[in-house]
Structures are given as C-alpha cells and as structure tokens.
C-alpha cells in the first residue's frame, strides 16, 4: 500500500512546487533535492546487495516524512470553515496537463494516506471494526468521479451568475496545456437513482442530487475578456429529504 501510494505521489512532484521539508538524516552520498534520492546508479550498486532493502525502507520513510509535511502545510493554509463561508473555493480539483491525469488530485491521495496512517496505529481488532466494508457501511448516494476537459464542459457559471466559456488550453512558456477538472456527481446507473439508500420511504421522499463548488479556471466572458475566474463544477452527490404529507 505504501509503495503504491509513493509511486502515485512521485508522478505529481513534477507538477507542483516542493513543500518545505525538515532535514532528514539519511545515510549515503550524493543526495540532492530530496534526502535519500540518488541521481545515478542503484541502491544495490552503491552500497552492495543488502543496501537495497535498507535504501528502499529509508526512501519510504523519507516520502512519508514529505507527505506528513504536506499535510501539516495543508492544515495551516486551509481556511477555517467556521470563519469562512466560502471554504469550498479552495478545493483542488483543477489540473493543467498535456494528457489525462491517471490519479485523483494529490490532496485526495493525501487524505487517503492520512486515513491509512491513522489505521496503521490501531490494533488489529480495532482496525477490523473501523473498516467500513467490514461493518457493512454503504454510501447514502452512489457517486462517480472523473477528469473532464473544457471540451466536455464548454461553458460554466461564474461567481456573478454569468455564463462564461471555459478555455480548453492554457498558454505556458513551452506551449499549451489542457485544463482538467475533477468532477464528482451522482451515478445515473447506480442503485440510488430512485432514492437515497437507507431512507424509510413510508415517511420520506428522498433524492440523490449533484451539488457544486467553485474552482478557479481560465475562462472568457461574453465581452471576449480572458481571465482566471471562479466557476462552478460538480463536486459531490448528496441526499435531499422531504417529509411525506397527508399520511
């Protein structure tokens, strides 16, 4: 699990700035940007065959340290929900890339890894009981998440309520990159398309509905003015209830 997650995190490092890291005491020579990462040769060729396993463990520990630093930084910069009603303006669901991203946004992976670390500190018995699948837990509404492009969205609604055109490509110093949006919406083919799961239909009318949040994207308004604006995209699937009358 840890190695798989580290592999996904490595693919993101080329698209983001490195977060401040504390110095790590890692053995070996030639370490540069990241402690424990070498620019030439393999772990076995430098310190012998037995050094490979030690180096792999050290590398895993180093990346765990980096991830913990990123989680700490995220907690510091994330606005308080009690003092900021526009907290979902800061969701990280937009990526500029030359190809379709293969994984969810990095912050989603960090949250999953944080939950994994919390579970790792539990006893085996507590861990089994904390696993939602073992407890038979199911989502109230079935949802799907996927990356979409501006070619799929075409237009969107900005914070002023106006309709703007979402630009498919963003100019950069070495060419152009496509805008990708990570959207979450209710699954039309799921088991909850006729109502929320676990709701007493004798007393309640229920419906799974897709809700939206604001993210920043490069757009063009009706006056052909191009700029970065906050637009609404699908970000979750929630259950809405209304009580049945006349019963």
UniProtKB/Swiss-Prot annotation:
Subcellular location(s) per record: Secreted
PTM description: Mature BDNF is produced by proteolytic removal of the propeptide, catalyzed by a FURIN family member. In addition, the precursor form is proteolytically cleaved within the propeptide, but this is not an obligatory intermediate for the production of mature BDNF. Can be converted into mature BDNF by plasmin (PLG).
Propeptide position ranges: 19-128
Keywords: Cleavage on pair of basic residues, Disulfide bond, Glycoprotein, Growth factor, Secreted, Signal
Pfam short name (any one): NGF
Disulphide-bonded residues: 141-208, 186-237, 196-239
Cellular component, GO annotation: axon; dendrite; extracellular space; synaptic vesicle
InterPro entries: Brain-der_neurotrophic_factor, Cystine-knot_cytokine, Nerve_growth_factor-like, Nerve_growth_factor-rel, Nerve_growth_factor_CS
Major site of localization recorded for this protein: secreted
Protein name per Swiss-Prot or TrEMBL: Neurotrophic factor BDNF precursor form
Organism: Ursus arctos (Brown bear)
Name of the encoding gene: BDNF
